[in-house]
Amino acid sequence: MLILLSCAKTMSDVSKTKTPLTTFPGFRKEAAEVALQMSQFSVEELERLLKVNPKIAVENYRRYQAFHSEGTRELPALLAYTGIVFKRVHPQDFSEEDFCYAQDHLRLTSFCYGVLRPLDMIRPYRLEGDVRLPEPGNRTMFDYWKPILTDRFIADIKKVGGVLCNLASDEMRGLFDWKRVEKEVRVITPEFHVWKNGKLATVVVYTKMSRGEMTRYILKNRIESVEQLKTFAWEGFEFNEQLSDETKYVFTNGKTE
């Protein structure tokens, strides 16, 4: 089973956690080109393109200016992203065996790097999927990456059993030819819902936390089969057979109001 997670907007370049090894990103040449083009934008342009405030725009202007410098700090991708999902994965207490297992069974999307393995060394950046690069052809990041990533992604899934546990946000499907992915491998997309006023609702923060917790559960327990995936339980969330089907695994908090 391969897990797909979305990258986070927040990143760090410092960590005390040691990993058994580090690797180069599979698409580092493309990432360098993406970053080079992003470095041509002014602070004001980045503020508009990334939809951020001036402070964050300045921070990322500096990041892109330093992206190609030898002294720029790097971290393994799983330690570099610091959003809610990654806090719940909590790789800081992973064993060497956990990291090695994750390297084969987890992939992280990235608008700058394409797709990353957990131990791929990356530099801080911020990028959105609808940003258009001048070259080639003024394409969005989705259109840029789709023909590059799809074959490699499908091959990675097939290497570990042909099942994808899709814990990424919906927009990340745009980085791949998703119809091809669904045709060539089995895709299961877990959903997490809570009862609110007698109806099931999606609470973004719970969804993010649950995605991180499920990722941790799969990696720590070496979950390989779809049946084992159904055993995930956290903070009252449990597998709901009635609401689930072959492609959508629904987990609810089990409290009908």
Swiss-Prot record:
<dbReference type="GO" id="GO:0033194">
    <property type="term" value="P:response to hydroperoxide"/>
</dbReference>
<dbReference type="GO" id="GO:0005829">
    <property type="term" value="C:cytosol"/>
</dbReference>
<comment type="similarity">
    <text>Belongs to the UPF0246 family.</text>
</comment>
<dbReference type="Pfam" id="PF03883">
    <property type="entry name" value="H2O2_YaaD"/>
</dbReference>
<protein>
    <recommendedName>
        <fullName>UPF0246 protein BF4021</fullName>
    </recommendedName>
</protein>
<dbReference type="InterPro" id="IPR005583">
    <property type="entry name" value="YaaA"/>
</dbReference>
